[in-house]
Amino acid sequence: DLFKVANRFNTEIIWGVNFSATLSEGWKGAQFLVRLLPALDGVSNAQGWENATEDLWNSFDQQNDQRLDVTLKRSFTYSDGSIKDFDKPYVFKYWDSQAEPKGNNTEAIFPAIRTAEMYLIIAEALNEINQGANEEAVIAINAVRNRAGLTTAVPTDYKGFKKAVLNEYRHEFVMEGHRWFDLTRMCTPQEFVSIIKAAKPESTPKEY
């Protein structure tokens, strides 16, 4: 519901970019939500310019993380029950098919700052200050994890908790422009390259 057009002024989004459905010039309308989609019958603007990696897909808790099904999809079911399978995962989190089934301009909001980020910032900061997670840090990260359906305990040692926080940033903010900043802030250069290589093993040194 977070990204539904009708619910765009929700309390989760602290600050966001509000697009207009009435502007038709160039890229002024909110088309970011469908430019990520694969080609679908009846969706005129789907381009599939940026798809998710297999590494991202596999990193989710496939059984329990409720964010997976609303964020990424490997197939699409049409209203007549027919199914289209994809050869890779695509980002569906922004598309409100009820508000604009053909993928034209909508009144969607692109979130810049969300409440979930504030919880994770608290968790990250407390772990750095204390060189390990105290009770407040665990409560903060669990505010995000529990909402997503995750109830398993997170490690409280410094490195283990830091990895858990980075993982939550990754899953909570898919295609919201966070990943690069999270990796450069929380990882050493060696860790950064290792993570990128795992995500895109076909990439060249120049692309890094």
Which residues are covered by each model-predicted region?
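Acidic/polar-rich alpha-helix caps and helix-coil junctions
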Residues: D1-W27, Q62-Y208
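Active-site-adjacent substrate-recognition loops and nearby beta-strands
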Residues: E25-R35
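Short, cationic low-complexity segments
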Residues: R35-N51, L56-W57
